Amino acid sequence: MSQSNMVPVANNGDNNNDNENNNNNNNNGGTDNTNAGNDSGDQDFDSGNTSSGNHGEGLGNNQAPRHKKKKYNRHTQLQISEMEAFFRECPHPDDKQRYDLSAQLGLDPVQIKFWFQNKRTQNKNQQERFENSELRNLNNHLRSENQRLREAIHQALCPKCGGQTAIGEMTFEEHHLRILNARLTEEIKQLSVTAEKISRLTGIPVRSHPRVSPPNPPPNFEFGMGSKGNVGNHSRETTGPADANTKPIIMELAFGAMEELLVMAQVAEPLWMGGFNGTSLALNLDEYEKTFRTGLGPRLGGFRTEASRETALVAMCPTGIVEMLMQENLWSTMFAGIVGRARTHEQIMADAAGNFNGNLQIMSAEYQVLSPLVTTRESYFVRYCKQQGEGLWAVVDISIDHLLPNINLKCRRRPSGCLIQEMHSGYSKVTWVEHVEVDDAGSYSIFEKLICTGQAFAANRWVGTLVRQCERISSILSTDFQSVDSGDHITLTNHGKMSMLKIAERIARTFFAGMTNATGSTIFSGVEGEDIRVMTMKSVNDPGKPPGVIICAATSFWLPAPPNTVFDFLREATHRHNWDVLCNGEMMHKIAEITNGIDKRNCASLLRHGHTSKSKMMIVQETSTDPTASFVLYAPVDMTSMDITLHGGGDPDFVVILPSGFAIFPDGTGKPGGKEGGSLLTISFQMLVESGPEARLSVSSVATTENLIRTTVRRIKDLFPCQTA
């Protein structure tokens, strides 16, 4: 029987029970022990010890005193069964229940009390031992499972490369790349299935992994004359679409480029560091080589690397930006100051819904610094667009000229593009990555510092242009035109303001087109150390231009003044008579101004001569600035046609314009913002020199144009002496 069923009993008046529990070896001490039990009963009850103390000293057998064993009153099986049955119903009996139970079982109420206490303690201990045992078994099982999984992880191999895949040995970038690689591999499998189906229908075999470059002719760029009279920096033979053997390579290259762009656009240090003079983030080439061990291949000898990243908020939704990037006419128009020409050669993949998700197309482009002194960069690449999630898009470019024979481009685009994330109120967060290799040694002149530091085509140049152009679009689409009114300004209706903004937009578009799309002879003449590019265009049946031969002359020069200072001076109407030959020394007045950007200097203005002048000419001026470039563009317009357009509801597209103006760049020596360093100016004039559809260019017309541009350059230089630097 367990100990819980044996309750220590003090002297309860039952001398027979006490005598039976005494030691039989001490016959003479029975009476004494019983009396001792009576004397110390209360003490023994508290301690649970029923021994009688030290009354055995006078024993007749002279033996040493012995401690007596504890006395227990063992309950009968019937008593235990009754109490256990009662315990199951009520483990905590009150005093009345204990008295009733004691009377029923012939026990003392105190015995009942202690039995229930012991029973509760016993049950509690048994439950705790059971729970501890279960937890111990579960813990051992989890330890064993954990050890098994650890061993499995350390022994696992990458199915792609066969290398170890221990998570503890991988960087975050590597882990992210492996996840992306698995997803892109699945896409390739799906596309391969589609390609096989097409192959069965057309009879043209498709190889998944061709190992040799196809004998494909080089692309046909169909660009006009390049800068400095050259014909570009590559062969211009005709080509057809990419053949069936090349397309799988191009697709796999585009998928890998997208994977790399996603990492490049999101990972910070140590992959990216502070850029030159605090401009866009610059790429850590050593870290790049560690992170991306494959891709476009090793860097080309003699090529210079330009890599940067910039992030900004843009006033356009992601789908609008994607559409602008995927259509070459919109792309070249949006980035007219950077992209001279663009062409889509072939669309390899297209989204059936028409939203550009998954579109893959082969393109070529000519990138330019607006100057006749800088050679253009030409690139042949594939552009891939993919939606990465809800409100998140990515567009990536990567050169594919190395897949084609007989082509020698000097600009190679590694994975470059942008990550576009939807924000609130129609805005987008754009992270732009620009990563190119270029061989442009010996083509710098005064632009050497700007180009060699990577600022000419840096990511902040692209982002700054995008932000500025989106501001312009928003202002045209808005009905709340922000005009600057004063006492001498004319009053314009909303139609008049809209017409004026459209004319200013045409001036900018035509100015850039005149710098890049002119065809015909290109002549260079040395004028005080500057080269002047003179080109001709013939205008026929263009309602926005006069018919005849139009000459476009351009040159670049340096000024020892910050870009902001030069921009603010040239845009002011009150300063124009100091440098504009067409003003004939007369003061110009601003009679209307409409802002088309956050910066109030981004605006369209209408200028005219003083009230005493008999001139019928007015000037529409477009001024635009961002941290990387500024423009002061203008065109003389007929006063009568402008009055009809602004007040009579005329079509602004029929106002005849020939734009001229200035492109202002930092010289690369100052900090961003245009408040330090010098300025690089490109001045361009467009003039009608011979009217009529059959007119031809004459030598005197060229001489007149050169003299005009030379005089303007000299006047501006005189206004900014060297001591202002």
UniProtKB/Swiss-Prot annotation:
Residues 46-64 have a biased composition (Polar residues). It comes from the Eukaryota. The lineage of its organism: Eukaryota, Viridiplantae, Streptophyta, Embryophyta, Tracheophyta. It is found in: Nucleus. Residues 65-74 have a biased composition (Basic residues). Probable transcription factor. Seems to promote cell differentiation. SUPFAM superfamilies: Bet v1-like, Homeodomain-like. Disruption phenotype: In plants missing HDG3, HDG7, HDG11, PDF2 and ATML1, increased cell division leading to cell overproliferation. The keyword Transcription regulation applies. GO terms for biological process: cell differentiation; cotyledon development. Belongs to the HD-ZIP homeobox family. Class IV subfamily. Transmembrane segments: none annotated. It comes from Arabidopsis thaliana (Mouse-ear cress). Gene3D superfamilies: 3.30.530.20, Homeodomain-like (1.10.10.60). Residues 117-201 form a coiled coil. This is Homeobox-leucine zipper protein HDG3. Pfam families: Homeodomain, START. Residues 68-127 bind DNA. Its main location: nucleus. Residues 1-74 are annotated as: Disordered. Residues 243-475 form the START domain. Keywords: Coiled coil, DNA-binding, Homeobox, Nucleus, Transcription, Transcription regulation. The gene is HDG3. The keyword Chaperone does not apply. GO terms for cellular component: nucleus. Expressed in siliques. Residues 11-40 have a biased composition (Low complexity). Interacts with AIL7/PLT7, ANT, BBM and AIL1.
